[in-house]
Amino acid sequence: MGLREFAGLKRDDQRLDPFALARFAKLLVATFAEIEPYLTPETRAHLIGDGKDKWSGGAASQTLPDGRKLIILNPTHGKNRQNATLMEEICHVFLGHKPSRLAIKKRGKNGETIARDYNEAIEEEAYSTGAAALAPYTALLRMVNDGKTSQEIARHFDVSRALVEYRIKVSRLWDAYKEKVFQGD
């Protein structure tokens, strides 16, 4: 069963709400305001200040007593970006991925902390699976053939234009998209 069917969606053009799906993946999505009291002022300032472009979201490595995992999303990102980030975290669960560890591994040559046990293959698998669930191929194909722009498609699915363009490209619809959208130029 696919993620969209699991979420109860009947049509390929229905919007998938990752926040509603998160509970089925045993994820507790906490708002930044809910965790803020537990952060030092320096950590808070970094996460929503200088470091805001260095993270999208994350899951706690330890499960909560009720079996759920805690997810925090970057509050400086818009809803469409948070949808993609949360969907990626959901896909990690459904795909059975081992969580990345968040620990200081080493310091870079400029003194910056390199702090994640990052597995590019599983991150790409989770992102691409989540993106496909958010913007499914059959609906994407129809919208591309109808001459919809990536911005219009993004608004329809409540995702970013970058995610839609990624899906169009990996679905090998880019040439058709350019032909339809830019035919008047």
What positions do the PLM features span?
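Active-site hotspot residues in diverse enzymes, especially metal/ion-binding acidic/histidine motifs
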Residues: 1-185
